[in-house]
Amino acid sequence: MMQHTSVWYRRSVSPFVLVASVAVFLTATANLTFFDKISQTYPIADNLGFVLTIAVVLFGAMLLITTLLSSYRYVLKPVLILLLIMGAVTSYFTDTYGTVYDTTMLQNALQTDQAETKDLLNAAFIMRIIGLGVLPSLLVAFVKVDYPTWGKGLMRRLGLIVASLALILLPVVAFSSHYASFFRVHKPLRSYVNPIMPIYSVGKLASIEYKKASAPKDTIYHAKDAVQATKPDMRKPRLVVFVVGETARADHVSFNGYERDTFPQLAKIDGVTNFSNVTSCGTSTAYSVPCMFSYLGADEYDVDTAKYQENVLDTLDRLGVSILWRDNNSDSKGVMDKLPKAQFADYKSATNNAICNTNPYNECRDVGMLVGLDDFVAANNGKDMLIMLHQMGNHGPAYFKRYDEKFAKFTPVCEGNELAKCEHQSLINAYDNALLATDDFIAQSIQWLQTHSNAYDVSMLYVSDHGESLGENGVYLHGMPNAFAPKEQRSVPAFFWTDKQTGITPMATDTVLTHDAITPTLLKLFDVTADKVKDRTAFIR
């Protein structure tokens, strides 16, 4: 019996059988969400034949990719193991949160810090990686491969490539009308294919980064003509706080008709204007934040070249406005890169943030960014000042960590990161409690500004960088490509407040606005004009 087991264990397999086996495994285990989306779009009862051909085409594509990537004997096993691990990791986040892997999502992943990564890890993730990644990889690693001679190997490899192409092309030809509609109307469904989509996006991102590295690094100016009509020596200096929000969605704002009072403190402050129809530039922090300060607008904006483009903060700094960015999130996403480092401060640790020990998770709170702002004002006495406060806000999936106990108004709450396993209302409760903390932070920001209203014309602008999915259609978090992102990820709250003495008039609450309105708003607040955005709608008149 022992001898029989030993012989079985060392039984050799053809490299082509091994490649085909991995392709079958990845097709079946890494694409559950893809097939679920397919069955929703094409009900199996009416489209069984077509749905089966999609499975065949996907297997053909998987077989082609694995064959091409592992064509050399010394890379065969490493490549197959890498594909198995990649399939396990990417499919977990796709199946759990609805994540798709375009270049923007990959950039987000690369910029995720240790705390954010920890929020995403759990027992289910580890079990998925072991079951669908590690164990199959061990089988690949230890199986004996019987490599043919070079000539036979080449012919068989070519045969496998031809077979792969046949598996792809024949069903497409046989169901040409179906596939014409599939590729034209339902193009976003392809984004759920793992690990093919991540592989494609990695290649695309590498190409983008190479072009960026070889491109000229000179700043492209968009507002050389910018002029400030009045200076602080001609009027009261202006003090503006811009709260860059995180992951807040407009339909959970009480001002917009939400049944819960999620912004009770703002509702008590005179002069707050809520904007109910604002669309974000993108669905991720890495994409949206640079866009919020860009001159290009969402239609022209390119996240890959944004750091080499003049933004509105560069302009205001050049004109003499004192700029400060405090960050309790990740960083400024390149917005502050061209300004002196002293104008940026990291408030995600107790080094700068004085309010980090009010919760069991030792998370630094957004309100800590308000501590010590009086010192900045004193150091820039009599000057125009713009202060950016970049929130942690409602960053998921651990919404329950984003607020102190005093904001736990809605209970019970989801206290885990496997959101689909939480009772849905408990997930909503945790998210809404985090909004209460944001309400408090904005209110305190306004109250701080009011203490300086005698010496300065004071104003506050709040806009969230993007929204959030909370389980609608099985999608969680954010980061979907704009082409098919749900409205929950792009419809964001925005508020404006100004002291009555400033004479500034906000736009109507139902004005249709986007992140494109931020740059002209910041310019107007400091009496600056620039031709590039002179016709762009702002949050103020």
From Swiss-Prot:
One GO MF term: phosphotransferase activity, phosphate group as acceptor
Regulation: EDTA may inhibit activity. May be inhibited by ethanolamine.
Signal peptide bounds: none
The protein's enzyme class: transferase
Annotated localization: Cell inner membrane
A Pfam family reported for this protein in Swiss-Prot or TrEMBL: EptA_B_N
Main location: membrane
Cross-referenced CDD domains: LptA (cd16017)
Impact upon substituting residue 465 to A: Abolishes transfer of phosphoethanolamine (PEA) to a lipid A analog in vitro. Almost abolishes resistance of E.coli strain Rosetta to colistin and polymyxin B, by comparison with the same strain expressing wild-type mcr-1
Protein purpose: Probably catalyzes the addition of a phosphoethanolamine moiety to lipid A. Phosphoethanolamine modification of lipid A confers polymyxin resistance. Confers resistance to polymyxin-type antibiotics such as colistin; in the E.coli strain W3110.
Protein name per UniProt: Phosphatidylethanolamine transferase Mcr-1
Protein's organism: Escherichia coli
